[in-house]
UniProtKB/Swiss-Prot annotation:
Organism expressing this protein natively: Francisella tularensis subsp. novicida (strain U112)
Catalytic activity: N(6)-[(R)-S(8)-aminomethyldihydrolipoyl]-L-lysyl-[protein] + (6S)-5,6,7,8-tetrahydrofolate = N(6)-[(R)-dihydrolipoyl]-L-lysyl-[protein] + (6R)-5,10-methylene-5,6,7,8-tetrahydrofolate + NH4(+)
Pfam families reported for this sequence: GCV_T, GCV_T_C
GO molecular function list: aminomethyltransferase activity; transaminase activity
This protein's name: Aminomethyltransferase
Keyword Transferase: yes
Keywords from the named record: Aminotransferase, Transferase
InterPro entries xref list: GCS_T, GCS_T_bac, GCST_C, GCV_T_N, GcvT/YgfZ/DmdA, GcvT/YgfZ_C, TrmE/GcvT_dom1
Biological process annotations from GO: glycine decarboxylation via glycine cleavage system
Highest rank taxon of the organism: Bacteria
Enzyme kind, highest EC tier: transferase
GO cellular component terms, A-Z: cytosol; glycine cleavage complex
Function: The glycine cleavage system catalyzes the degradation of glycine.
Family label: Belongs to the GcvT family.
Length: 358
């Protein structure tokens, strides 16, 4: 099993370790709900070094990424980040990614842990006709510092000059400090930062954050936080067999430049013209019970929907889920232990900055 540079720190903190995409990762440090609530109210830190930063450099870096990705990196200013999907030729989602623009000739992409090898292979396969170099940065670690007090904590562990620059970062912007990259991004629905730094320096940084008020959080809390925020998890909410249209991600596909071609565009436009017969929704179970991935949602006209992610929401204290359902259907119910329980369909976003949206 693969280990991140912080593996020994997790063991020392009595973390419960699990296999996540071939990596030994902390699922929690004792209480998933406490870790979740701490991120909503204070500051939690996550080791996400199982994800991979890949640098795309060269005179045709922008041209290549405009072809590779469904969102348009030409819209990005330097030191800005963008969410988007990478599609195959059938418009199936290969991965969802954050792309960071350093300069016109240098971009950084962070890919999901389960797709590290396949994504890099896809980059290389499609880069052959472009003047670009693709460099997986395997000597970098990634730490997410998340929560309303994230900025206070991170300011305590850096110099005053750097603290001022970090505090001034806008959402989806970033800055390099030597080999460290600090981005105001995250996967929790809270303010926070993702810090990409050399593996040789990550333990000292992690320990400094803990000494200055942060609490560690595992992948369990990361999952319930992102679910409350309505953020997709690759492999659960979407995969290679689904297009952005079917998963509420059409907003991330940029069609504004009709002259730009990108992988999957033709198939995507055909699917868009044909229309999809499902919609992407949030699901709330008002009574006791738990929503889980794979559960069916039944409607009174006989049609069905399916939950792709589900859990108890520590913030809302009810069970919530993400699902795709028929566009026209009424009176949704789920079957839990032989009982039909009513669910409410809502917008697929439940919590923002600690506050309920439902």
């Amino acid at each position: 099993m693969l280990k991140t540079p912080l593996y020994e720190s997790h063991i020392a903190a009595n973390a419960k370790m699990v296999d996540f995409s071939g990596w030994s990762m902390p699922i929690n440090y004792g209480s998933q709900i406490q870790e979740h609530n701490n991120v909503r109210e204070d500051c939690g830190i996550f080791d996400v070094s199982h994800m991979l930063a890949v640098d795309i450099q060269g005179s045709e870096a922008e041209k290549f990424l405009r072809y590779l990705l469904a969102n348009d990196v030409a819209k990005l200013q330097e030191n800005k980040a963008q969410y988007g999907c990478m599609l195959n030729h059938d418009a199936g989602i290969v991965d969802d990614l954050i792309t960071y623009k350093v300069t016109d000739e240098h971009f950084r992409i962070v890919v999901n842990a389960g797709n590290r090898e396949s994504d890099v292979a896809w980059f290389n396969q499609n880069a052959q006709n472009f003047d670009v170099a693709i460099t997986p940065q395997t000597d970098l670690a990634i730490v997410a510092v998340q929560g309303p007090k994230a900025v206070d904590v991170i300011k305590r562990v850096v110099t005053k000059e750097i603290a001022a620059e970090i505090e001034a970062l806008l959402p989806f912007s970033f800055k390099f400090f030597s080999k460290w990259m600090v981005a105001r991004t995250g996967y929790t629905g809270e303010d926070g930062f993702e810090v990409i730094l050399p593996t040789t320096q990550v333990k000292k940084f992690w320990d400094s954050l803990l000494e200055n008020g942060a609490q560690p959080a595992g992948l369990g809390a990361r999952d319930t936080l992102r679910l409350e925020a309505g953020m997709h998890l690759y492999g659960a909410d979407m995969d290679i067999s689904t297009t952005p249209l079917e998963r509420g991600l059409g907003w991330s596909v940029d069609l504004s430049d009709e002259h730009r071609d990108f992988i999957g565009k033709k198939a995507y436009l055909a699917k868009k013209a044909q229309g999809v017969d499902t919609k992407w929704v949030g699901v709330v179970l008002k009574t006791k019970g738990v929503l889980r991935a794979g559960q069916e949602i039944d409607f009174d006209n006989g049609e069905k929907g399916y939950i792709t992610s589900g859990s108890f929401s520590p913030t809302l204290k009810v069970a919530i889920g993400l699902a795709y359902v028929p566009k026209q259907a009424d009176n949704p119910v789920v079957n839990i232990r032989g009982k039909e329980l009513e669910v409410e369909l809502v917008k697929p976003k439940f919590v923002k900055n600690g506050k309920s949206l439902i």
